[in-house]
């Protein structure tokens, strides 16, 4: 487990170099979407339409930020529960998206897709939306404005603190932590 500063895009090579448990400070362009936005994007793909952004090597942050205060780039921007995107994540990875930022566990189907497409799941700290917003230097609404907080946005972040929860080989920090605890403490 390392502490690393990485710059996007999240290429296949960069994704493969990350390991579950790595502390990462992320800099570059990311996109925001939650379940309503993911549903629309997957429906568009099913109709053969283009997405509102190029998904190649993209990282998607599962967030619905609050409105920005006067003079601020964005409001509070904490992660939402990633499981709500599990039905859509394999499709998004199949068209090139590689990174996902959120909180909580992922279904085995998502982990299988991550192994197939060299995806990485980063965990952001829940409840720290105001602090995470300080890492967001630019925010631009790009699609689905009618979804309000769930609209798609393009963000530029600097040194966003994250942890690799699941790496491109399927290693899962949550499972590793449980196994380590049981090894040390047994089934008590």
Regions found by a protein language model. Give the residues of each.
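Feature captures the catalytic cores and cofactor-binding loops of soluble hydro-lyases/lyases
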Residues: 32-33, 37-160
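Short, structured beta-strand/loop micro-motifs enriched in basic residues and often containing a Trp
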Residues: 1-10
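A broadly conserved detector of short glycine/acidic/proline-rich loop/turn motifs that flank catalytic sites
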Residues: 10, 30, 65-67, 166-170
């Amino acid at each position: 487990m390392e502490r690393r500063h990485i710059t996007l895009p999240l290429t296949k090579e960069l994704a493969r170099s990350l390991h579950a448990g790595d502390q990462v400070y992320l800099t570059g362009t990311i996109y925001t979407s939650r379940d309503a936005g993911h549903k629309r994007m997957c429906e568009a793909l099913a109709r053969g339409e283009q997405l509102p952004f190029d998904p190649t090597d993209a990282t998607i942050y599962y967030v619905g930020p609050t409105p920005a205060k006067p003079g601020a780039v964005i409001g509070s921007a904490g992660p939402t529960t990633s499981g709500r995107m599990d039905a859509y994540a394999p499709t998004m990875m199949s068209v090139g998206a590689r990174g996902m930022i959120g909180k909580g566990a992922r279904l085995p189907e998502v982990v299988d897709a991550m192994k197939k497409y060299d995806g990485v799941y980063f965990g952001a700290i829940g409840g720290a939306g105001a602090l995470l917003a300080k890492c967001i230097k630019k925010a631009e609404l790009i699609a689905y404005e009618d979804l309000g907080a769930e609209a798609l946005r393009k963000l530029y972040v600097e040194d966003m603190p994250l942890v690799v929860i699941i790496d491109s080989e399927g290693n899962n920090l949550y499972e590793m932590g449980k196994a380590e605890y049981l090894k040390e403490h047994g089934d008590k």
